[in-house]
Amino acid sequence: MSPNGSDRSPRRPMRRKLLQALTAGLVLATATGCTYKDFPRLGMPTPVTEEAPRILSLWQGSWAAALATGVLVWGLILWATIFHRRSRTKVEVPPQTRYNMPIEALYTVVPLIIVSVLFYFTARDESKLLDLSKKPDVTVNVVGFQWSWGFNYIENVDGSTGNAKTDKNLAAIPDRFKEAFPANAGGVYDVGTPGTRNPQTNNPGPTLWLPKGKTVRFVLTSRDVIHSFWVVPFLMKQDVIPGHTNSFQVTPNREGTFLGKCAELCGVDHSRMLFNVKVVSPERYQQHLKDLAKKGQTGYVPAGIAQTSHEKNRETNNL
């Protein structure tokens, strides 16, 4: 009985508040902008490459594990808070669990198991996603600079002359990447500015064209600071680092125009460092390269900064 003579339990208001909080959380969850088709993807974009479903599956598994862990931890916290809070009528010392070896072992082993499982799946998928053993059908040198993008299409195109393996503008790219370049690839390029817009969609930034169903290798270089190359529906991004060359491969399997952006804060106009990716048929892709050559955009724009300092010793052009 409470001091004022009422027999109303003090726990009832707490339970009522908890029920109200759970109801509000359910309303907020159902009021999001996601459709029922988006829920299995947890709000992530629809994959448009052969590699993207692996990334989506990794994220789904990680979020499911995090949610299960969170529900367990939150449940224990709420359970202890609601049902084991200090009594107003009894003063007693709660049971002590110090030096309880089974409980302490459980606290240690369970987190280790969770981390080990997450590490295994992450390492397994990362090794597959970054595997460059397959020879690419198309190679594109993506050049990041403040504050736009350049795209060097390393291809044999009618009207272009030169050799990508010896071109001075590509000197910053290590030889281990040049080995996969086509022989005598004169190449064509496209380059944007922060004010560039796609004439068809009016989306900001230059447009990178890719052929559907072909393995595309991106060789990422920077002229100035660290950028990050992110095509949103690819579900993958990679840093573009001055003095260090990164690379990954994808196989687009869906035609369309997709948005890309720099995902690394790189200066005042970082927010304008946008681009588009247009996936088309292989025939339309080849025609686009010929159109660039007719415009006089043959050869290559400077790829970036040559590797220096300890990076030069670790990964040189002679590898």
Swiss-Prot record:
One of its GO terms (cellular component) is plasma membrane. Its cofactor is Cu cation; heme. Residues 1-33 form the signal peptide. Gene3D superfamilies: 1.10.287.90, Cupredoxins - blue copper proteins (2.60.40.420). The keyword tRNA-binding does not apply. Binds a copper A center. SUPFAM superfamilies: Cupredoxins (SSF49503), Cytochrome c oxidase subunit II-like, transmembrane region (SSF81464). It is a multi-pass membrane protein. It is found in: Cell membrane. The keyword Translocase applies. Keywords: Cell membrane, Copper, Electron transport, Membrane, Metal-binding, Respiratory chain, Signal, Translocase, Transmembrane, Transmembrane helix, Transport. One of its GO terms (biological process) is ATP synthesis coupled electron transport. It catalyses: 4 Fe(II)-[cytochrome c] + O2 + 8 H(+)(in) = 4 Fe(III)-[cytochrome c] + 2 H2O + 4 H(+)(out). The chain crosses the membrane at residues 63-83, 101-121. Cu cation binds at H227, C262, C266, H270. Its EC number is 7.1.1.9. Belongs to the cytochrome c oxidase subunit 2 family. Subunits I and II form the functional core of the enzyme complex. Electrons originating in cytochrome c are transferred via heme a and Cu(A) to the binuclear center formed by heme a3 and Cu(B). PANTHER family: CYTOCHROME C OXIDASE SUBUNIT 2, CYTOCHROME C OXIDASE, SUBUNIT II. This is Probable cytochrome c oxidase subunit 2. It comes from Streptomyces avermitilis (strain ATCC 31267 / DSM 46492 / JCM 5070 / NBRC 14893 / NCIMB 12804 / NRRL 8165 / MA-4680). The gene is ctaC.
